[in-house]
């Protein structure tokens, strides 16, 4: 994940699901403009992509492999804690999931028992299948460290749980992450990009003033298990803020 080790090759769970989410969005756009032929093509791409993820990446231990390159015969069995980002995209856009519901629930439960359990403030980028921290980087390569994570990714993961009905768990995960950023380390107006990985202190290792952390404002819709349009409707959060500002 943006690092030499373990790297991403071939079929990648995180990237694959994001592409399927993009195809879902494009399918809806095509239907809205009356291009049913292209919409059906997008739907078929989603079906085929989801089947490829099932056939090549699903691991019976309850998650999608980090990656699998069928040409080179190389795979990474690390559990990527944020592999469900594409699921958040479809949920937040009010679109059908690209993956079977039981796979989504099982994967999130696995991440809860591994990546989330390894971090005092969010969820580690990676975990071993047995729930232990990943091995240290290989000689001559670099990585972010065994306990690293990105705050906006943690927000998306929290919303994954909310959209799957685990609102309290998702809220607590988001709270722990923001409490670490704002209260523990005082990064309130200097929001970080990535947290320290060599030890589980929750300190920033890189980045400041990262606007991707404004994903915070996506939480109200997820808490209510609504899509992104809901806060903009009459009486929604955005509508109330704008009316209050006009007074």
Describe every region a protein language model picked out.
Residues 1-9:
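Aromatic- and acidic-residue-enriched carbohydrate-binding clefts of CAZyme catalytic domains
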Residues 6-7, 16-17, 21-32, 36, ...:
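Active-site core of glycosidic bond-cleaving carbohydrate-active enzymes
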Residues 47, 52-81:
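Short, surface-exposed recognition loops and adjoining beta-strand edges that mediate ligand/DNA contacts
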